[in-house]
């Protein structure tokens, strides 16, 4: 096997007992690859491990976990200064793995690990909210956000992405639309939103294609708003073809401003952020990510 530069895997603590992953790492080490492994325990660990990766001089920092882990690692990488910033590798080990799935990361751990180490590093965009918090995949608001943030961990562990749908159906009687105003480049809308999706990536909530036209290297955010008076039809519309749905508003812009008369919550790659005012902007070519050659989210 050809020689490859060293990598550092930042592994979500929930995945430490993954025997197939351990075997895949040991096999690649036996083939001559240098793979450092660090395990997260609390918030902030990923950023500290990225700093360590810089000191070790690795070529790739691999995020081993779900969308939240990928978010933490990628956010830490774009905050690095100087030259020789490591590329991002992705090892999908979460509940939904929305970003990894949409960009075509293999489900097989050995194949995903090899791609994360030896794949072509391509410059991709990220998004920033209120000049602070970032997301690599999607910001979602409305009832979908409340579903994903409130779904019990045991249900997610047992059922994966389907757990979000089940929990949403259980909560139908308590979920209400959010009134807000959204502005962007050549875009303005005001009304009651059942679901808001602002995507750098395409899917969220366990496989729902909220922003099916999004690309991760076009310098744009894709916006989709599901409007209407009833929650259930909106949920159903996200599970089927909705190209002709009159209750869907779409837009594209390098930034969006959102204002609401009451507090609303956005889910940023799995992390909730609440407020009344949000400025969301794209950060073009913010980091390099190792992706398959046929990645569908590249222009």
UniProtKB/Swiss-Prot annotation:
GO terms for cellular component: cytoplasm; plasma membrane. PROSITE patterns: DAGK. Its EC number is 2.7.1.-. Gene3D superfamilies: 2.60.200.40, Probable inorganic polyphosphate/atp-NAD kinase, domain 1. Keywords: ATP-binding, Cytoplasm, Kinase, Lipid biosynthesis, Lipid metabolism, Magnesium, Metal-binding, Nucleotide-binding, Phospholipid biosynthesis, Phospholipid metabolism, Transferase. GO terms for biological process: phospholipid biosynthetic process. Its cofactor is Mg(2+); Ca(2+). ATP binds at residues 40, 66-72, 95. It comes from the Bacteria. Binds 1 Mg(2+) ion per subunit. Ca(2+) may be able to substitute. Probably phosphorylates lipids; the in vivo substrate is unknown. This is Probable lipid kinase YegS. It comes from Shigella boydii serotype 18 (strain CDC 3083-94 / BS512). The lineage of its organism: Bacteria, Pseudomonadati, Pseudomonadota, Gammaproteobacteria, Enterobacterales. The gene is yegS.
């Amino acid at each position: 096997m050809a020689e490859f530069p060293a990598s550092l895997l930042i592994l979500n603590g929930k995945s430490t007992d993954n025997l197939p992953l351990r075997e895949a790492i040991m096999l690649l080490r036996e083939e001559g690859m240098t793979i450092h492994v660090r395990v997260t325990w609390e918030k902030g660990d990923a950023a500290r491990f990225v700093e360590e990766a810089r000191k070790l001089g690795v070529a790739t920092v691999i995020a081993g976990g779900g969308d939240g882990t990928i978010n933490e690692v990628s956010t830490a990488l774009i905050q690095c200064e100087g030259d020789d910033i490591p590329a991002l590798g992705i090892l999908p080990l979460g509940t939904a793995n929305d970003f990894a799935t949409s960009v075509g990361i293999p489900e097989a751990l050995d194949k995903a690990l090899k791609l994360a180490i030896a794949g072509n590093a391509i410059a991709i965009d990220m998004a920033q909210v209120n000049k602070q918090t970032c997301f690599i995949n999607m910001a979602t608001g409305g009832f979908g956000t409340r579903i994903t943030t409130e779904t019990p961990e045991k249900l997610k562990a047992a059922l994966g992405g389907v757990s979000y749908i089940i929990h949403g159906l259980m909560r139908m009687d308590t979920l209400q639309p959010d009134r807000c105003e959204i502005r962007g480049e050549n875009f303005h809308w005001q009304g009651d939103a059942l679901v808001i999706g602002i995507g750098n990536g395409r899917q969220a909530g366990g496989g729902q294609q909220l922003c099916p036209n999004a690309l991760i290297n076009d310098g744009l955010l894709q916006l989709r708003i599901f409007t209407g008076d009833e929650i259930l039809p909106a949920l159903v519309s996200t599970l089927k073809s909705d190209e002709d749905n009159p209750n869907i508003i779409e837009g594209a812009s390098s930034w969006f401003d959102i204002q609401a008369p009451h507090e609303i919550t956005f889910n940023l790659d799995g992390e909730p952020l609440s407020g009344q005012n949000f400025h969301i902007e794209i950060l073009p070519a913010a980091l390099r990510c190792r992706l398959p050659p046929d990645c569908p989210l590249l222009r």
